């Protein structure tokens, strides 16, 4: 006994129902798009976590404090020669400046000493554009304890003949 239209419901001799074929292809495509979407969401989540963890190296962050400190984020006066941010024992490293231009030749990827081959005034200038104020240039290269507490001065201030700042 022969069942009529059997080749329309199940594959026989390489033939199958076009409706079943289209449904199968649709299900496969839907699952593929779903899996790719989930993978993209996972990548975005991990990228966000990586960016959150790397935000401690932004220029407006004061190392070691845990909180942004715009007044002291780019210049750190340290009276001791053994600081944790710059491992260079060849010279006095009392002033540590954030290095916005990473150079593999420096001893630290994020901080550099003013007595390295970089220009600290140039780096300080770039920091002043971000923060709006600037420490006096004398406090960069001066290791005297009396000058470590100089307040930030405006970038338009100049020194007069007596060494005092005056506004222009």
UniProtKB/Swiss-Prot annotation:
> Which residues lie in Low complexity bias regions?
142-157
A Gene Ontology cellular component where this protein is annotated is:
membrane
- The record lists the membrane-crossing segments as 24-44
UniProt keyword annotation of Transport present:
no
Where would you find this protein in the cell?
Membrane
| Paired cysteines (S-S) | none
Topology in membrane: Single-pass membrane protein
Region Disordered: which residues? 69-92, 142-168
Q: Which domain of life is it from?
A: Eukaryota
Alphabetized, the UniProt keywords read: Membrane, Transmembrane, Transmembrane helix
Report what the protein is called: Putative uncharacterized transmembrane protein DDB_G0288353
